[in-house]
Amino acid sequence: MDFTASDTARLTGISVRSINTIYIKLRQKIAIQCEEVSPFHGVIELDESYFGAHRVRGKRGRGASGKTIVFGLLKRNENVYTEIVPDCSKATLQGIIRGHIELDSVINTDGWRGYDGLVDIGFDKYFRVNHGNNEFACGERHINGIESFWGYAKKRLMKFNGIDKKMFYLHLKETEYRFNHRHDNLYLDLLKLLRKNPL
């Protein structure tokens, strides 16, 4: 799935339509696997990122309209979990945090106000880095891991020269799966996955 459907069709002699069908089914299996996440425990980094066409002049970050917002949780030096969200409000982000992170975890975020009140809901070990004040790391207080994942994801998805919004979720989950298995033999991992859940 490193090639576009057109390139794969050209290499194999199979129609683009058939290749697309196979790719979609594979990505659906991968997405199901990615959604079977246990609650994260340990040192966790949280951040949001915006995916979509190049920015419109003057619009950046949280004000960028028309972009897909993705919220990410990364267990430091291990796995990432991503979720497409409608907004970056406190209610949205904290709902996901409560459902995916154990209370005694150490949480690191940037200074976004959507994270206000995490201590009030039981996350006592909560630390921030304030990017607005040019603070990016203070010892173990940083979100460099999740920001590294965003760079990896954007670079990987860029090679497709645009992804249909309806298909973005599946491509995102494939990227998440690849990142989480970056030290493994991806081919063997996919074979195990398909043995367990055939197409």
Label the model's feature ranges.
Residues 1-199:
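Residue-level recognition of single "structural anchor" positions
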